[in-house]
Every structure is written in C-alpha cells, then in structure tokens.
Amino acid sequence: SATESRNYLKMTRLEESVFFAKEMGVKKVGIAFCIGLANEAHFCAQYFKNEGLDVQSVCCKVCSVDKDLLELEKIKPGQREAMCNPKVQARLLNEGGTELNFIVGLCVGHDMLFTMESKVPVSSIITKDRVLANNPAGAVYSRYWRRKLGILEEGTV
C-alpha cells in the first residue's frame, strides 16, 4: 500500500515496480517477455538496471519446438511456428534466483502458466492486447468497443 499512497498519480507502473522492489529489499528481478515485445522488454530491463536492480530476462520461445511436432493449431498454417514455453520461462528465472518477476506481454493463458510456475511473486508491466496497442483497458474506455462488446449502457458516453 505504500507504493500506492506515496506515489499516487506521480509514478508510472514501471516506476512503481522499481519502487515496490526496492521497498521489499529485492535485488534481482526477472522479466518473462513475449518475443513480439522484445524491444519493450529491453527498455524495461534497462530502466531496472539503471535503478540498480540485477535483471534476468527470458523470451517466450525459449526451448521451443515447432507446433507441428505437437499438432498444435497455428496462426499461419503451413509455416514454421515455434510454440511458447511459459513454464520453462518461470523455471529458468527460478533457477536464476530472481526474487520478483515481471511479465511483459505474455499471451492470455501463458501469463497464468508462468505465474503458477514462478516460485516468487509476479506482476505485469505490459499486458498484451494486439488489437488495442497493448492497452486492454481501451475496451472499456472506448464507446465503440463497449457497444461492440454489448456493454454500452444507456446514457453513458
């Protein structure tokens, strides 16, 4: 609660994450990221490092195999497509001794598997939403999306 009370409307989520880690005495953090957000993960890691934290990061495609081997559905059938591996991401960060882990854009479901496998607390820095520029709250902020989703209430803007 100190993170919220001391920094309300003053810090971004990224800054609050560092503040929280330092308040908890954390020295080593992990970042589990989606390959599609590798640049964003890089900038998050750089900020953490600039703030004195040791950072380990693991891409979602670590130790992956082609989806054909497991007869998994593909986004583009007929093309090679590596599967994601959120449990191995968590295991590698566990082995690396991270004290707090952060998610940068893992898919729905993959984020849950990662969180279940992590031995330390997990928070999200970026939540993936391919339609809304990684801003899932846009679906409830936007009148268009509220109407499309059937949640636009009479008299609301």
Regions found by a protein language model. Give the residues of each.
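Electropositive, gly/pro-rich neighborhoods at or near active sites that engage anionic ligands
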Residues: 1-28, 35-39
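Long, charge-dense
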Residues: 44-91
